């Protein structure tokens, strides 16, 4: 099913994100190209913090997935995704990644712009649950805001990000408000800290997949 109102709502939502996040669509293109390079095609896929279903938009037209699970703690977002993608091979779970019930069930787990909203303890629990949800040799791909290594770097990166948003037509006040959320509404960690966290949670391989502005993609292999 592809309800017109759901499609409109998701398109409007995605356009607002594009005004905020540089190269937003590249997140999902990189997910697809990375999974395509894996030796075995995925049959089971969990997307945590699925939002309106942007990851599924790319995945379901690229792979013959037998089971795709949408998970989000927002019933409103989950309903939009359900309106767009309800089919026999899809499931919709309302819940928090820090409380995932899945164990050894998925070939792929994705989390796009999710885990940086948590405290250090909450982030570790979220990443550990993603690890536990994977089958052996399963793939975890996440995209997160990251923290620069210095105050000078942080100021430069934030100003650059603000300039990007201004160029997309956002108001100066909206841009300042968004940049002001750093370490108040989301809590980024450095690239090194993220990779170490993944190793601490059990991943035998942890790599940087993609990087631009203050966003990075990470790859973990169980």
Where are these regions (language model features)?
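A short glycine-rich, Lys/Arg-flanked "PGG" loop and its adjoining helix->strand segment in the class I
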Residues: 124-136
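Core SAM-dependent methyltransferase catalytic element
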Residues: 204-222
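Conserved beta-strand signature within the Rossmann-like core of class I S-adenosyl-L-methionine
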Residues: 137-145
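Conserved class I S-adenosyl-L-methionine
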Residues: 1-40
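C-terminal alpha-helical "lid/dimerization" subdomain adjacent to the S-adenosyl-L-methionine
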Residues: 145-199
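Short catalytic micro-motifs in class I SAM-dependent methyltransferases
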Residues: 113-116, 144
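Class I SAM-dependent methyltransferase SAM/SAH-binding core
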Residues: 46-48, 52-99
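A conserved beta-strand element that flanks and buttresses the S-adenosyl-L-methionine
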Residues: 110
């Amino acid at each position: 099913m592809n309800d017109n109102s759901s499609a409109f709502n998701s398109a409007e939502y995605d356009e607002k994100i594009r005004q905020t996040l540089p190269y937003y669509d590249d997140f999902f293109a990189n997910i697809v190209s990375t999974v395509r390079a894996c030796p075995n095609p995925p049959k089971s896929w969990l997307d945590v913090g699925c939002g309106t279903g942007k990851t599924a938009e790319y995945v379901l037209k690229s792979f013959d997935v037998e089971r795709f699970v949408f998970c989000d703690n927002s019933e409103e977002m989950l309903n939009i995704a359900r309106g767009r993608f309800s089919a026999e091979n899809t499931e919709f779970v309302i819940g928090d990644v820090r409380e995932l019930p899945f164990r050894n069930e998925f070939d792929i787990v994705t989390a796009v712009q999710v885990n940086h909203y948590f405290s250090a303890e909450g982030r570790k629990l979220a990443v550990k649950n993603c690890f536990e949800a994977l089958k052996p040799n399963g793939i975890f791909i996440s995209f997160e805001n990251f923290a620069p290594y210095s105050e000078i770097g942080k100021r430069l990166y934030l100003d650059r990000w603000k300039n990007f948003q201004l160029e997309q037509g956002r108001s100066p006040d909206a841009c300042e408000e968004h940049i002001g959320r750093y370490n108040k509404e989301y809590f980024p960690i450095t690239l090194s800290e993220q990779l170490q966290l993944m190793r601490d949670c059990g991943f035998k391989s942890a790599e940087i997949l993609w990087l631009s502005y203050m966003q990075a993609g990470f790859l973990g292999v169980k």
